């Protein structure tokens, strides 16, 4: 990376600010990440991997800018329950589960709109 490189930092509000890098801090952070990745502690390895991802270049066309996110992303994920056997995860099963999930979502939206006295079929 060039000596005059800069960083783009996004704060919790998504506001960008440019800051000049501190080379000694970067080297120190890199060695800490390497130690964490090489450690036997699974949690340390996960933290190191997460930090490494957050420091990826924001744009591949300009390697002098790096995007660093201050806030970790916590998106709600609904896992699909484990099936009794791997063979049960065929296309019809997956399709049925998706349809059921969409049906539940549609019903929740319908109820939250204040239409509690109507049947679900009238929503279709």
UniProtKB/Swiss-Prot annotation:
Domain of life, source organism: Viruses
UniProt biased composition (Polar residues): 37-47
Annotated segments matching region Disordered: 1-65
Name used for this protein in its record: Uncharacterized protein G2
Record organism: Microplitis demolitor bracovirus (isolate Webb) (MdBV)
């Amino acid at each position: 990376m060039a000596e005059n490189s800069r960083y783009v930092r996004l704060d919790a509000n998504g506001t960008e600010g440019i800051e000049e890098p501190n080379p000694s801090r970067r080297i120190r952070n890199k060695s800490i990440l390497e130690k964490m990745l090489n450690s036997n502690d699974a949690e340390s390895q996960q933290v190191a991997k997460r930090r490494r991802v957050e420091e990826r270049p924001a744009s591949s066309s300009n390697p002098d800018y790096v995007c660093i996110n201050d806030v970790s992303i916590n998106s709600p994920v609904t896992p699909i329950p484990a099936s009794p056997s791997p063979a049960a995860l065929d296309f019809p099963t997956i399709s049925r589960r998706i349809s059921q999930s969409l049906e539940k979502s549609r019903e929740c939206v319908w109820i939250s709109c204040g239409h509690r006295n109507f049947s679900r079929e009238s929503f279709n």
